[in-house]
Amino acid sequence: MLPQKKTDSFRLEPVPDQHIEVKDKPRRKWYIGETSVWVFLFLYLIAIAYPLLWMVMSAFKNSDDIFEHSWSLPSSWHPENFVSAWNQGISSYFMNSVIVTALTCVITVFISAWAAYGLSRFEFKGKGFFLVLCLGGLMLTPQVSLVPLYSIIQSLGLYNTYWALILPYAAYRIPFTIILIRSYFLSISKELEEAAYLDGCTSFGVFFRIFLPMSVPILVTSGILTAYHTWNEFMFAIIFIDDENLRTIPAGLMQFRDALQTDWGVLLAGLTISAAPIIILFLLMQKYFVRGIASGSVKG
């Protein structure tokens, strides 16, 4: 009979409680930090959203109701304020802003996309200088060039025309838009471009068939940023346009305010109409905006 080997018996020691406590501390800190962030974002949302909600609610009130019940819902709703605001001049300002904003966006995005394509895919002398020139354009404020720009517009016969606003707006937005779109184009694979050249595509074909369809998020983002700047710009709109029939929303609201100093409900209805398009545009294109900003910041 074979002798039996002695086997050592092992006993598992319980894990000390202090290790469990150490693991719980980071989780507790993370929970407190997340709660603080949500509280901050909620307060920030109230600070941003409440003035807009107050403006919309007050647009449905009459002047007496605005002063007597400033922080509450309208005691009686007056949707006719919007009709009065539209008929008393907002319609003209609104359509002028739509024309100027649409043409500015098309010109800015198209020229910037062409320039960004050349800067991201071709090598030529002066390429670095052109990029520096774009950066320099970002540093030039409109106030600095106001006097010479006014003289140029007068000499070209553009004063009191839509082009007196469209061309300066596009000129000031193109440098930033070029850099933004170029960063996105750099993230597009060169293999796709090479395959298109092998299939017989020209540079124009590659641009229109590959780059533009793949760059919808950044193009929409550029359009939104340009539209926001153009729609709300005030200085050029008040200086380069003197004709009441050509004024855009920011400049026209000054005349609208002077004409309705006592009718606050109609005035706030006009302000609501002027603010609505950009808010709606951003809400509809929000997913493209976020994707465009995130992808456009990958490479520089």
UniProtKB/Swiss-Prot annotation:
Transmembrane segments annotated in the record for this chain: 37-57, 98-118, 129-149, 161-181, 204-224, 264-284
One Gene Ontology CC term in the entry: plasma membrane
Subcellular localization(s) per the UniProt record: Cell membrane
Disulfide bonds: none
Major localization class: membrane
Keyword list, A-Z: Cell membrane, Membrane, Transmembrane, Transmembrane helix, Transport
Ranges for domain ABC transmembrane type-1: 94-285
InterPro entries: MetI-like, MetI-like_sf
Protein topology in the membrane: Multi-pass membrane protein
Keyword presence, Transmembrane helix: yes
PROSITE patterns: ABC_TM1
GO biological process: transmembrane transport
Family: Belongs to the binding-protein-dependent transport system permease family. MalFG subfamily.
Annotated function: Probably part of the binding-protein-dependent transport system YurMNO. Probably responsible for the translocation of the substrate across the membrane.
Protein name according to UniProt: Probable ABC transporter permease protein YurM
Annotated organism of origin: Bacillus subtilis (strain 168)
Lineage of origin: Bacteria, Bacillati, Bacillota, Bacilli, Bacillales
Annotated gene: yurM
